[in-house]
Amino acid sequence: MEAPSESVHNNHFPKFVAGMVVALILVMVWSWYGREKTSLPEVLRSELTSRDGLLFQELGTQPFTGFMIESYKDGILKSRSQVVEGLLHGVSDGYHPNGQLQVREHFEKNISHGLRTKWFASGIKMSEATVVEGQLDGTFQRWDETGTLVEQIELRAGKAHGFSRAFYPSGYLKAQASMQDGEVINQQSWPDNEMKVASIPTSDTP
């Protein structure tokens, strides 16, 4: 009865070894990736200089690639921005004095491009917008410190285009304007607890 048992164990042993090898490889790859991710230098903004629109370290001969950082007087991180070949390129974060994330936006070759989000010092989201090549484009939303939506604006190429809406703390609509290329087409306002967004006709959308 013991021989079959030994055979079973022997059959499983190669699979066990293979599994261990795969796990070891994954750990090594993850460790390498982590080192690569953090290997870029972090340099104070005050130690960088601008030449012909590109950022250089004070004695550097090549445009800077790494992270540009700023700190408050007490040493708490104020901002951290990725720089590639002298240009803002990647994620740029700003922080409140309490360490809470204040703003996060994305850059492509020194131009804001992508989602831009801001937060209150409490951690509650303040606003969110999409930026396309430096201009707001799409839906901009703003909240108060309780997390209640207070404003919503549709934009196109940096101009209000579509509905711009303001809300009461109750969530009911306070005012609405129909916009086209930054110009007001028509506007309405309501007392609190009267109008919900879902009940407003939208046939006059530009």
Regions inferred by a protein language model and the residue ranges of each:
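Glycine/tyrosine- and acidic-biased, solvent-exposed loop/turn segments at the edges of beta-strands
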Residues: E2-P206
